From Swiss-Prot:
It comes from Oryza sativa subsp. japonica. Keywords: Chloroplast, Exonuclease, Hydrolase, mRNA processing, Nuclease, Nucleotidyltransferase, Plastid, RNA-binding, rRNA processing, Transferase, Transit peptide, tRNA processing. CDD domains: KH-I_PNPase, RNase_PH_PNPase_2, S1_PNPase. Residues 852-862 have a biased composition (Basic and acidic residues). It holds the Pfam family KH_1. The lineage of its organism: Eukaryota, Viridiplantae, Streptophyta, Embryophyta, Tracheophyta. HAMAP family: PNPase (MF_01595). PANTHER family: POLYRIBONUCLEOTIDE NUCLEOTIDYLTRANSFERASE, POLYRIBONUCLEOTIDE NUCLEOTIDYLTRANSFERASE 1, MITOCHONDRIAL. This is Probable polyribonucleotide nucleotidyltransferase 1, chloroplastic. Residues 1-66 form a transit peptide.
């Protein structure tokens, strides 16, 4: 067998020849095809020769070459050597927006392949990259995992629950993991199968500078410094728009006033990922925001490249293991016309079965021809050069010349060997060839797999009110993608509570939960807690719908939307947006206007497939077009603006002109979808379901809230119990929310609360009031449900009374007048003031100087009161306490609902 110069120098531990370095340079520049002419190293499972730390593998000695960083000099990299013989720290300050971020490495996490600390203000994110010692089996998916965690200690907090240690990742942390993963994955070369793990922790958080965009940059720096042979450096920023001005990496306070929340990542020359939401910004404004962010990313990447040149590790380009070029030719020759016919099948399941059968046929034919063999121990391909006959063990190739030395590296065959391929290689190549054929069909023929043109959308139909007991429901179908959306309305108790670094009591009154069961694609799979994809798609749809919701003051409901994907063939998250919008209308939610979502695709290199070289944008992509294309760009909004967006790509970046073309084409698609949604049959009900709860909001004076709650919540519990409402929620600002299942109980509770919190005025007269309690010194009269006052015995009648019970009993009704409100808010009432002879009798008594008959009893009573004072004092205290706590409301008086609150 002929050993190539690059492979031979690798085995002899010599520097590779110049042309080998040139091939690596192109790979770094984003052209992995330049690696194809180089033979892949032989795979041997778990052997020392493939161990990264075993010493037998020699990495390429060529220096890492990156894209041009422009004319401006990058920020200075500072090297700080420890005076005590400790590790050397490298650091650089990078200008971002109106401030600098600090990147440090070399002094912490030294056993990782690379680790960095990135600081913005007092927010610090630590990221590390580690690789496995041996490669995984070949696959079409780069084995990379990302983990991000926000330590509560970063904000000086500890979990309030029983378990103090951080555990399962929160939804917000999962979303940040996806933000880190998605821009890094396109920069990884095909054929690199070493499992890679990125760990990121927030170690310090100042509540001002957000850690999520910082974590993207930290992971990008760590990856650039590590041995992973990524193609280009990436960085991430956040862009906000405040007062029509774009701000890079705005503070949390600035974001409160921002109309845009854009998180993006890219290289020094292209965009890799964008995600965010806005208040129906135009396409032009969004493009300006992306351009602003790209400028900041460019400067960060320049600085990172300078740091890599100073302290970066050599890249493992020699570990890239690609299928041999001959295999592509064999697969294309065998599949040929049958592959073209299979790709023309419109139905997804039938097409998948046809492609699977064709793949097996290709493997069978190659096996019969002697091209496919499987090593039983490792499942990797073997080369017949190891057992070639007529070999001369003394003859080897060194730098293209014969050397007859004693070093025996590889035998040289006098006959060209037949290459053996593994089944895994055949499957990988078949997938690539299928993708290539599909792209060629779209570019050359102008027709996609289902017969549509590039700008054409799939058929759309929708219907509402499928589920009679649900508060709102809709079924949205677009081609072979279908979403069943259900809306549930509730009170504050249904809100989604969030535990974050700063605010432990934050909650969401609107949230969308996305479910993607395996049955939606006709498969058998795992069922359980939502995975990262489901969390990410749900958040995207939630952000798309949130701007159209009415303010909480107008619609005080907690809204939960569930989107279950019943069929899937591309852009199921955008189907969730459309179905969710219809379900909201069906539930009677007064949305501002309808929204829709669409997924856009891309074939970037059309020249390769017979096109004119211009990028081809596809509207409403299917699953196959997503997998075979170069972009998945989801855009949601209405005819005039965008509410949410998310872009992932599979190539090393796209430019702003391509993005502009995609956004404008997406706007046309949204208009078409909204028009189709307006034809929904049956249409949305647009009224509250009879099964939805009723919520009424009242405003009372803040100092009256305690009257509603009562001692230990006694009063509010009694109102709920006796009126039958579901819940009563009070706020410190005087807001009272009543949730009930029927109007009758709602009106009862409204009347009770209105009377409890009313502000009585001296001189007001209350008619037909019930005596609730009789005491020796007077009677307690209920002037309104739950509000009582004391009518002293001297104010009960114009005649003298020895005991109140002599003339009145509990349950009697009298008219009273409010004559005094003391400092404690207690009411003093008088019935005598309303009697016709009250004023005349009082005047005659004053003129006579008082009668003897009245004085004697007063003296006798004084003695009696002296002997009974302790008992009467207790009674008075008990009555006062009862007055403060208010009586339990029972039957509502008609006057109760008429009394207003202030």
């Amino acid at each position: 067998m002929l050993a190539t110069p690059g492979a031979l120098h690798h085995l002899l531990l010599l520097p590779p020849p110049p042309h080998t370095q040139l091939a690596f340079h192109h790979a770094v520049g984003g052209v992995p095809a330049a690696l194809l002419p180089l033979p892949r190293p032989r795979r041997v499972a778990a052997s020392a020769s493939t161990s990264r730390r075993g010493g037998a593998r020699r990495r390429a000695a060529g220096a890492r070459v990156r894209a041009s960083v422009g004319e401006e000099a990058p920020p200075v990299v500072t090297e700080e050597a420890s005076t005590s013989g400790g590790p050397t720290k490298f650091s650089t300050k990078i200008p971002v927006g109106d401030r600098h971020i600090l990147v440090e490495t070399g002094h912490i996490g030294r056993q990782a392949s690379a680790s960095v600390m990135v600081t913005d203000g007092e927010t610090i994110v630590y990221s590390s990259v580690c690789l496995a010692d041996t490669p995984n089996d070949p696959s079409d998916f780069f084995p990379m995992s990302v983990h991000y965690q926000e330590r509560l200690s970063a904000a000086g907090r500890t979990s309030g629950g029983f378990f103090k240690r951080e555990g399962r990742a929160k939804d917000h942390e999962v979303l940040v993991c996806r933000l880190i993963d998605r821009p890094l994955r396109p920069t990884m070369p095909k054929g690199f199968y070493y499992e890679t793990q990125i760990l990121s922790w927030v170690f310090s958080y100042d509540g001002i500078h957000s850690p999520d965009s910082l974590a993207i940059t930290a992971a990008g720096v760590a990856m650039a410094l590590s041995e992973v042979p990524n193609k280009q450096t990436i960085a991430g920023v956040r862009v906000g728009m405040i007062n029509d001005q774009f701000v890079v990496n705005p503070t949390t306070e600035q974001m409160d006033d921002s109309e845009l929340d854009l998180v993006m990542a890219g290289t020094d020359s292209a965009i890799l990922m964008i995600e965010g939401y806005c208040d129906f910004l135009t396409e032009e404004k969004l493009l300006q925001a992306v351009e602003t962010g790209q400028g900041a990313i460019r400067e960060i990447c320049k600085a990172i490249d300078g740091l890599v040149q100073k302290c970066g590790k050599k890249k493992m380009f020699d570990a890239i293991d690609l299928p041999p070029p001959e295999l592509y030719r064999h697969v294309e020759d065998i599949s040929g016309d049958e592959l073209v016919k299979a790709l023309q099948i419109k139905e997804k399941i039938l097409r998948r079965k046809a492609l699977s059968a064709l793949e097996e046929k290709v493997i069978t034919i190659l096996s019969e021809q002697g091209y496919v063999a499987k090593d039983e121990s490792s499942g990797v391909s073997e080369n017949l050069a190891d057992v070639i006959e007529e070999e001369d063990e003394d003859e080897v190739i060194v730098d293209g010349e014969v050397d007859e030395g004693e070093v025996h590296i590889k035998p040289v065959s006098r006959k060209p060997p037949r290459q053996l391929f593994s089944e895994v290689d055949v499957k990988l190549v078949f997938k690539e060839v299928s993708s290539k054929f599909l792209r060629r069909r779209i570019v050359e023929g102008g027709k996609r797999s289902d017969g549509r043109s590039p700008c054409e959308l799939r058929p759309i139909n929708s219907q509402c009110g499928l589920l009679p007991r649900a508060h709102g429901s809709a079924l949205f179908t677009r081609g072979e993608t279908q979403a069943l959306a259900v809306v549930t309305l509730g009170d504050y108790q249904m809100a989604q509570r969030i535990d974050n670094l700063v605010d432990t009591e934050e909650s969401k009154s609107f949230y969308l939960q996305y479910t993607f069961p395996p049955s939606s694609v006709g498969e058998v799979g795992r069922i359980g807690a939502p995975n990262r994809r489901e969390i990410g798609h749900g958040m995207l749809a939630e952000r798309a719908l949130e701007p159209i919701l009415p303010p909480e003051e107008d619609f005080p409901y907690t809204i939960r939307v569930e989107s279950t994907i019943t069929e899937s063939n591309g852009s199921s998250s955008m189907a969730s947006v459309c179905g969710g919008c219809l379900a909201l209308q069906d539930a009677g939610v007064p949305i501002k206007f309808p929204v829709a979502g669409i997924a856009m695709g891309l074939v970037l290199d059309t020249l390769e497939f017979g096109g004119d070289g211009k990028p081809l944008i596809l509207s409403d992509i299917t699953g196959a077009e997503d997998a075979s294309g170069d972009m998945d760009f989801k855009v949601a909004g209405n005819e005039n603006g965008i509410s949410a967006f998310q872009m992932d790509i599979k190539v090393v970046g796209i430019t702003l002109p391509i993005m502009e073309h995609a956004l404008l084409q997406a706007r046309d698609g949204r208009k078409h979808i909204l028009n189709e949604m307006s034809k929904c049959s049956p249409p949305p009900a647009k009224v509250l379901s009879p099964y939805a709860p009723l919520i009424h909001v009242m405003k009372v004076k803040p100092n009256k809230v305690n009257l509603i709650i009562g001692s230990g919540g006694k009063t509010i519990k009694s109102i709920i119990e006796e009126t039958g409402v579901d819940a009563i929620d009070t706020g410190d600002d005087g807001t009272v929310k009543i949730t009930a299942r029927d109007l009758s109980s709602l009106e009862k509770s409204k009347a009770i609360i209105a009377n409890l919190t009313m502000v009585p005025k001296v001189g007001e007269i209350y008619r037909n009031c019930e005596i609730k309690t009789i005491a020796p010194y007077g009677a307690f009269v209920e002037i309104a449900p739950g509000r009582e006052g004391l009518c002293h015995i001297s104010e009960l009648s114009s005649s003298w009374l020895a005991k109140a019970e002599d003339a009145f009993k509990v349950g009697d009704r009298i008219d009273v007048k409010l004559i005094e409100i003391n400092d404690k808010g207690q009411l003093r009432l008088s019935s005598r003031a309303l009697l016709p002879d009250a004023n005349q009798e009082s005047s005659s008594k004053q003129q006579a100087g008082g009668s003897t008959r009245e004085k004697a009893p007063q003296k006798d009573n004084l003695v009696k009161m002296t002997t009974r004072r302790p008992r009467r004092k207790k009674q008075a205290e008990a009555s006062t306490a009862e007055n403060n706590a208010t009586a339990s409301p029972k039957d509502l008086a008609s006057q109760g609902s008429e009394m207003g609150t202030e």
